[in-house]
Structure formats: structure tokens, C-alpha cells
């Protein structure tokens, strides 16, 4: 099991790289994360919902993702509550205290999934969540040491040196663990190092002397990996240069599936800017309203920041606008939540650019899809994750024609606005090229983002092989008993 001293220490990436190394060696390996809290999710072939990190790790292992790889997914919809998804299916919304009481049920699902994976594969690489040192969350823990103790699983601890204080993080984490949990930690990996390794060596020697545990390696800071982020929104401007399409995406408080824009970030003809609160929307050729876990609250927040007026101004000057999933729902005339699925029952005026209304409903739509853009026929593949039913005249001009005979979304009569429920809209090469051309790119080029992701997994595995003592690390993770 790989645990981290903090969130974003590198657990997901390390597990993905180790999965690829094991897969290369012919080992039947599967990833597993007992509990994930994230708004970035993926859809399995059978219509289940799991964290995107586990879908990426499955790809690294040469597998199709399954719900057993992430049996518990928590999707925050407020500061104190989340939608609880067990084995890929929503079980309802719970606040933090109610979920604490629910944990024995969640743990049963976790152990059942882990048992099935253990029976099918030679090696199951487990990823923890956050940090095992959160002493206030130790009771009924199912994500870190609580799980490791339940299945007698050895643990490697990873820490991010780039944020500073790496030795305090590692030694402090051990100090917060019980004696049996400390004994379970077999060693350390230090991530995101930049500089002269010889200057770090005295610290590594001190760490081993203090703890009696080895450092399995120091990983360099890797730039340019095209791998799905667990949840943190990447707000840095993309590195495109020359004449490019200026794309602006408002960072909503409950933004979901911002991995939709990874393919755009990697495209040499696109400059992506994620705009946070308190900042004006800069001049753009294309504005994209992203998915949201709390559409009405995020729409109210968007208005409170004056971004509705900025979008109207953008359209007056000829800019293009795309709404994806929750962003699509915002573009209609009205949003209705009669059952209070996102809070109090009620309704809210949409931005009014497309003639349709959306009513939130309990049944969640979860499916992988293939189809073509309605205008031009470029092939695409994506997935649906939404609880809304959208109806209205605007849907007579669909954005997408699906292979199963359905249509999706809408395009405005003037062709300036496109709305769709589909995530992964820019991942397919031809669809990405067609959408960039629609948005104003002359001689738009296709880019195979799936190939970029696969090349990144290979580069990651090569880096781990060069910088880790893999025989010692894998030996330390050998199944006990």
C-alpha cells in the first residue's frame, strides 16, 4: 500500500508508475483505492462511477477499470457533505457525521472489493487517501491504516519535497501512528526533488538513522506528464506560444471533471487559462463553462462575481461559448430541483442562451458513449455523468449524434454556442480538431491525447525504474502470511 504524508504527495502517480512496471514484467496487477474523495470521476464499461486516478492506474496495468478498483467514492457537494457512491452507484448524500456512522457499511464494501481483486490478480497495489496522520479521523478509518490493519498490508510512505519540510512530514507522520502502524511502514519514497542529490544525502542518512527505515529512492520533479489529476485544479497557464486559441474556463467552487480540459492544455494551438474567484474573465476566443456538482449554487456564484455579464460581453464581440454537463444546464432558461437534490427544493433562472429547461432527478445517468459531432461528423468518444433531464426546442439542433441512436446537447441558431452533457469532448483527435476549427483556429491540427497519456505512463515507469530501488520496494510490499 502507498500512503502519503499529505494530499497531492504523489500517491496516485506512484501507484500508476508501479502498475506499469509490474505490467511490463508480465505480472497480473490491479490498482485499488478503498475510499476516494474527488469530483473528477470516470465511468466504467458497466456504467459505474469511480475516481479518475483509478481509471488511469487501470490503464497503466493494461486493464479496463472496474468499480472494485475504487469501491467508495465521495463527491463533495457542500463544505460538510458529499454524495456517497458505493460500488459505482450513488447511495445518497451524507454529511460528515452521518458518513462517519456509515463507515462500517462502507468498510464491508471495501473489503469485498479487495477480496475479489486479490482472488483475480497476482498483485494489488493499494493507494491511501490524504494522510494517515489525521488523528481526528482515526476511528473507523477505511482509507489508510484502518484498511492496512484490516488486511495486514505493508505500507510505503511517500512525501513531496517540493513543498518543503519533507523530513518533518515523514518523521511527524510516523509519530502520529500507533506502534503497530509504524511497524507496518517498510520505508519511504521522496517525490518531486529538484537540485543536487548529493546535498540531500546527509538528510536521507539522518532519516534512516532516526526511523530505522530505508529510503527506496528520490524521484525527480517531472514536467510535462499528461496524466489525469486526482482533484486539484491546475490553474497555471498552458505553455502554448505563437498564434493560439485563447480559452478561458471559470473555476467554479464545485467544478467537476476538469480533466475535460487536459487535452486542450496539451495542444500546441491552444492557450488555456483557468480563472479563479475575484479575477475578471480575460479576453478570449472561447469560454467554457465546466461541469459542476452543485449547478444552482455555482450559477449563483458565477453571477455574484459578474461573470454572467462578462460572458454576455464575450458573445457580443463574437466569441464562442461551450457548456459541458452542469455548464450546459446553466445555459438554458431554467434549472429546477423539486426534490432538493442539491440543497433546498426550488428553481433558478439559467443564463437563457438556449431554449431548454433542466429538472434534476434522482436517477443518475452513467454511461460511456461514442458518436459524432452533428456538424461535420467528426468522431468522438466520451462519457455521461449527470442527474438532470433537459427538455426544450433547442435540442432539435443537437451538438452530438450518438451511435446508440440518441442525440445530445444543442447548438445555437447562430452557431456561436454549443452545449453537451458529454465529458471527454476534446480527447478524440478529429473531434478536437473540428471544435478548434469551429472556435476559430485556422488550419487546426488533430492531437491524439490518448497517445500522449500512454507515452506519459511509459516515461513515468522509466523514471521510477531509474530512481527507485525497485527490488527492495517490491519485496517490502510482498503480501504477508
Swiss-Prot record:
Q: Name one GO biological process term.
A: cobalamin biosynthetic process
Supply the SUPFAM superfamilies for this chain. Answer: Class I glutamine amidotransferase-like (SSF52317), P-loop containing nucleoside triphosphate hydrolases (SSF52540)
Q: In which pathway does it act?
A: Cofactor biosynthesis; adenosylcobalamin biosynthesis
Molecular function per GO: ABC-type vitamin B12 transporter activity; catalytic activity
In this protein, the active site sits at: 325 (nucleophile), 423
Give the matching Gene3D superfamilies. 3.40.50.880, P-loop containing nucleotide triphosphate hydrolases (3.40.50.300)
Q: Which UniProt keywords apply?
A: Cobalamin biosynthesis, Glutamine amidotransferase
Please tell me whether the keyword Amino-acid biosynthesis is annotated for this protein.
Answer: no
Give the InterPro entries listed for this entry: Class_I_gatase-like, CobQ/CobB/MinD/ParA_Nub-bd_dom, CobQ_GATase1, CobQ_N, CobQ_synth, GATase_3, P-loop_NTPase
Q: Tell me where in this chain the GATase cobBQ-type domain is found.
A: 244-431
Q: Which family does it belong to?
A: Belongs to the CobB/CobQ family. CobQ subfamily.
Functionally, this protein is described as follows: Catalyzes amidations at positions B, D, E, and G on adenosylcobyrinic A,C-diamide. NH(2) groups are provided by glutamine, and one molecule of ATP is hydrogenolyzed for each amidation.
**PANTHER family, alphabetized:** COBYRIC ACID SYNTHASE, DETHIOBIOTIN SYNTHETASE
Provide the protein name: Cobyric acid synthase
The scientific name of the source species is Ralstonia nicotianae (strain ATCC BAA-1114 / GMI1000) (Ralstonia solanacearum)
Lineage per the UniProt record: Bacteria, Pseudomonadati, Pseudomonadota, Betaproteobacteria, Burkholderiales
Gene that this polypeptide is encoded by:
cobQ
Amino acid at each position: 500500500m502507498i500512503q502519503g504524508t499529505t494530499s497531492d504527495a504523489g500517491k496516485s502517480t506512484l501507484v500508476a508508475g508501479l502498475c506499469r512496471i509490474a505490467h511490463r514484467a508480465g505480472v497480473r496487477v490491479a490498482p485499488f483505492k478503498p475510499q476516494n474523495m474527488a469530483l473528477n470521476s470516470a465511468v466504467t464499461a458497466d456504467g459505474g462511477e469511480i475516481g479518475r486516478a483509478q481509471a488511469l492506474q487501470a490503464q497503466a496495468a493494461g486493464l479496463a477499470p472496474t468499480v472494485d478498483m475504487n469501491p467508495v467514492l465521495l463527491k463533495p457537494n457542500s463544505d460538510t457533505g458529499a454524495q456517497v457512491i458505493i460500488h459505482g452507484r450513488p447511495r445518497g448524500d451524507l454529511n460528515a457525521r452521518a458518513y462517519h456512522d456509515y463507515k462500517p457499511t462502507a468498510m464491508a464494501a471495501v473489503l469485498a472489493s479487495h477480496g475479489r481483486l486479490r482472488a483475480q490478480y497476482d498483485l494489488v497495489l493499494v493507494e491511501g487517501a490524504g494522510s494517515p496522520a489525521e488523528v481526528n479521523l482515526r476511528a473507523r478509518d477505511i482509507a489508510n491504516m484502518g484498511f492496512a490493519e484490516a488486511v495486514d498490508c505493508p505500507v510505503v510512505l511517500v512525501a513531496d519535497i517540493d513543498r518543503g519540510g519533507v523530513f518533518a512530514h515523514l518523521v511527524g507522520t510516523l509519530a502520529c501512528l500507533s506502534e503497530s502502524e509504524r511497524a507496518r511502514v517498510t520505508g519511504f519514497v521522496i517525490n518531486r526533488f529538484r537540485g543536487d542529490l548529493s546535498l540531500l544525502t546527509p538528510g536521507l542518512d539522518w532519516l534512516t538513522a532516526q526511523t530505522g527505515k530505508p529510503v527506496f529512492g528520490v524521484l525527480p520533479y517531472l514536467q510535462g506528464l499528461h496524466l489525469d489529476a486526482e482533484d486539484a485544479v491546475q490553474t497555471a497557464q498552458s505553455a502554448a506560444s505563437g498564434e493560439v486559441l485563447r480559452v478561458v474556463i471559470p473555476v467554479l467552487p464545485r467544478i467537476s471533471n476538469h480533466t475535460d480540459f487536459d487535452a486542450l492544455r496539451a495542444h500546441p494551438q491552444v492557450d488555456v487559462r483557468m480563472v479563479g474567484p475575484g479575477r475578471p474573465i480575460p479576453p478570449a476566443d472561447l469560454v467554457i463553462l465546466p461541469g459542476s456538482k452543485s449547478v444552482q449554487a455555482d450559477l449563483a456564484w458565477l453571477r455574484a462575481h459578474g461573470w454572467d455579464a462578462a460572458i454576455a460581453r464575450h458573445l457580443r464581440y463574437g466569441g464562442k461559448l461551450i457548456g459541458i454537463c452542469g455548464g450546459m444546464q446553466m445555459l438554458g432558461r431554467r434549472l429546477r430541483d423539486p426534490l432538493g437534490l442539491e440543497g433546498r427544493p426550488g428553481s433558478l433562472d439559467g443564463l437563457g442562451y438556449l431554449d431548454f429547461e433542466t429538472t434534476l432527478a434522482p436517477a443518475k445517468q452513467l454511461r460511456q458513449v461514442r458518436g459524432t459531432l452533428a456538424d461535420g461528423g467528426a468522431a468522438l468518444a466520451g462519457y455521461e455523468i449527470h442527474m438532470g433531464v433537459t427538455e426544450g426546442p433547442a435540442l432539435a439542433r443537437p451538438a452530438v449524434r450518438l451511435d446508440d441512436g440518441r442525440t445530445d446537447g444543442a447548438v445555437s441558431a447562430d452557431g456561436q454556442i454549443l452545449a453537451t452533457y458529454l465529458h471527454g469532448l476534446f480527447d478524440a483527435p478529429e473531434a478536437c480538431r473540428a471544435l478548434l476549427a469551429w472556435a476559430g483556429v485556422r488550419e487546426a491540427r488533430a492531437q491524439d491525447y490518448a497517445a500522449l497519456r500512454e507515452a506519459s505512463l511509459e516515461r513515468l515507469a522509466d523514471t521510477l525504474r531509474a530512481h527507485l530501488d525497485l527490488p527492495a520496494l517490491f519485496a517490502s510490499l510482498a503480501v504477508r502470511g
